[in-house]
Amino acid sequence: TTAVQQELSTGLMPVTEETDEAVDGDEEYSVYDFTQDDTETDNLLRSAGTDDSDWSKYGSRDFYNQMTEDEKSYWDAMDTICMEYLTTEGNAVNTSNGGYRMQAVWGSKLDADTMSNVAKIFRYSNPQYYFLGTALYTVYRGSEISKVWGIYPAFGVGAERAEATDAVKTQADTWQQQIDSCSTGEKKAEKIHDLICDKVYYNQALVDNNFSTENTEYSQSVYSVLCTDKTVCAGYAQAFEMMCNGSGIDAVAVTSYNHEWNKVRLYDSWYNVDCTWDDQSGGFYYNYFLRNDEYYDTCSQYSKNCHKEESYWEDYLPVCSLDSGSSWNTPGTLPEITGKADNP
C-alpha cells in the first residue's frame, strides 16, 4: 500500500431499508423448496445449471449452525438463489425504484425482525456473493413479506455479472496458489492478511463524499478488493473471510455501528483480525492481527467503540481469549492451546 490512509479508519455503510412489491420476476420460491437433504439440494442446483463446488467453500456456516430450523430454511433459500446468480446468467429482479434485487422468498414463519437479522448475518457470512448491496428490501405480496438484498446496478444483468464473476474467481485463484504454499494455518492467515493489505489502499475519498459513488466503487463488497485497488473496512473484512474459508480456515466477518472486521479460528481458538487498521500509509503492520477481545477493548476507547458488535450478533459470537502478542512489525506467536474453542 502506498496511498495515504487516515489512521484507524472505518467505513461500514449502514443497511438501508427499502420496500418493493412482488412482480412477475419473483418466482414462487418457498422456504420449503430448500429444506431438503443435501442430495436433493444438489440436484436442484444442477437442474438450474449450477455448479457450486468452487464457490460454497468461501462462505462461513458458523452462525448458520447455531440457528433454528426456520431460520436455516430462510438462509437456505437465499443461499440457493444467490448461488444461481453466481453461477448462471439469470437476471436479478427489477425494482420499482429503478434498481435490482434478489428474488423474493415466501412462506417463512419468521417475524420481520428475525428475518432481517438472518438476512444480515447471511450477507456477512457469504462474501462470495459479491453482487449483494447494502439495501435490504421488504417485498410485499398482499399481507406476506419477504426480506431480500438489493444488488449492485452493474451486476443486475446476468451476462455482465458473469464477466465480473470470472474476474473475482481469477484473482481468488491467483491468491490461492500463494496461500497454499504456506505450511500452517497461522502462516496462511498471515499471507491472506498481507496479500489484501498489499493490494489495496483505503478509499478515503469515497468516505469523504459520503459514499455517493458507492454504486461504482463496490466498497461494501469483496469485489472492491479482488477487482479494484481501493476499499474500506467492509472490503478488507470480507476478502479476509473469503480467502480464509477458501483455505480451510474458519473465519467470520462481524460488524459494529461503523466498522467491519474478522474473527478467525486457528488451532481451535478464536482471534480478532482487523486488516483495515493494520493497513497504514507507510505500509502494512500487525498490531491488530490475531488479538484477543481484551486487547481490542483496552488499547483505546476508540477501538472499544468501533469493535462493539451490533446487537443482532448477540449469542452468536465466539470469545477470543488468547492473544498472539503481535506488534506493529511482527505478527506474533500463537500461545500453546490448552482447551477447546468456544463455538461457533
What are these regions (language model features)?
Residues 270-272, 276-344:
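His-Asp-centered catalytic microenvironments across diverse enzyme cores
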Residues 159-225:
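Secondary-structure boundary elements
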Residues 4-149, 337, 343-344:
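Intrinsically disordered, low-complexity N-terminal segments that are enriched in acidic
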Residues 218, 225-232, 236:
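Secondary-structure capping and boundary motifs in well-ordered enzyme cores
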Residues 234-298:
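Hydrophobic/aromatic-rich core segments of domains that either
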Residues 149-155:
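Extended, well-ordered protein cores
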Residues 147, 188-192, 236:
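Residue-level detector of well-ordered alpha-helical segments, enriched
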